């Protein structure tokens, strides 16, 4: 039976690498795979999924208007892989859940669970509600512990505790942190206090 799977982690855990490896595994066996990534993430170019290891592959893009239904699948699609799935809208997650169960094509969504303030992305919250299976990928904090939080940095490398939820960036803009380091950091303490108020 096909299902919707949410593979999540903090920044820099290797989610895109795992997606590209999964795509390779299907292709190596002679199977067709469909890849999607968020149109707003153009760090590697529009419609390109690139890992920090340097491997990349072209992909279709999704935006807020994309409809995920049977029309997006080729006749012989063996699996649908979606990168940056935190940017999906809840209605799109519902469409993907329906598609997985009516098309018999497994759908694997890779993304962040929460933003730089520790708040859920709408797409991730919907995936945590509807996905049939979950896989957490381990990221590592600078202290060596498991990182589950994301911290945003400004151009000077200082921690940011306010701003828009979505700001595309890589290692120069975000770091993964364990909860202890996230909250002990001065900006994290300010955010925790403002969230509690």
Curated annotation (Swiss-Prot):
It catalyses: thymidine + ATP = dTMP + ADP + H(+). Its EC number is 2.7.1.21. One of its GO terms (cellular component) is cytosol. InterPro entries: P-loop_NTPase, Thymidine_kinase. The keyword Kinase applies. It is an enzyme of class 2 (transferase). The active site is at 84 (proton acceptor). Keywords: ATP-binding, Cytoplasm, DNA synthesis, Kinase, Metal-binding, Nucleotide-binding, Plasmid, Transferase, Zinc. Its main location: cytoplasm. Pfam families: TK. Zn(2+) binds at residues 141, 143, 178, 181. GO terms for biological process: DNA biosynthetic process; thymidine metabolic process. ATP binds at residues 9-16, 83-86. GO terms for molecular function: ATP binding; thymidine kinase activity; zinc ion binding. The keyword Zinc applies. It is found in: Cytoplasm. Homotetramer. PANTHER family: THYMIDINE KINASE (PTHR11441), THYMIDINE KINASE, CYTOSOLIC (PTHR11441:SF0). Belongs to the thymidine kinase family. This is Thymidine kinase. The lineage of its organism: Bacteria, Pseudomonadati, Pseudomonadota, Betaproteobacteria, Burkholderiales. The gene is tdk.
